Amino acid sequence: MKHKLYCFDFDGTLTTKDSMIELIRYAHGTKGLILGLLANIWYLVMMKLHLYPNWRSKERILAHFFGGMPAEAFDVLCNNFAALHHTDIRPQAIAEINDIIAQGGKVIVVSASAENWVAPMLAKAFNSMPTLSGTHLEVKDGKITGKIEGHNCYGEEKVNRIKEYMQANDIERAEYYIYAYGDSQGDKQMMEYADESFYKPFRQ
């Protein structure tokens, strides 16, 4: 019998809102969020037109709002945010993942958002913490730079993270039956890699 692996996108799939946007709103208020996005509007428009890389736009936004912030203070901010906003995770998703884990299924959340705030949100929401593979943020001289360390966990990188998970567990792809859950273009490759996929689930 094959091992079952359940791979979930985070923002929009498990959550009702974009967690990075909500973190910025939490830290800077709605006015600060809007002003910061307007200051970077050119790059956001270029990204939507596929003329500017998604990961570079993310770096600009993160650097604008959090660049230079002490990493410890940023993690405190993320934990406080998670304490309030773990309820942004869809109840249907919580119930299904809790059930999968209780039955011995393996769950990995593969997220383009940073682990700094996704991890505490998952820890607050679920009975048992799922495996998380998200984007990592660069820290230099003890401060958040706004740059991504390694690769943005988006598109093909999500497949790479799933492969890394399998390699770490010393199990071949052929031994897994993979389920993928996503809601956007960034999940396309992951959903194609899976044996079975679900687009925009948990919305009933």
Go through each PLM region and give its residues.
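C-terminal cap/substrate-recognition subdomain and adjoining C-terminal extension
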Residues: 1-5, 76, 83-204
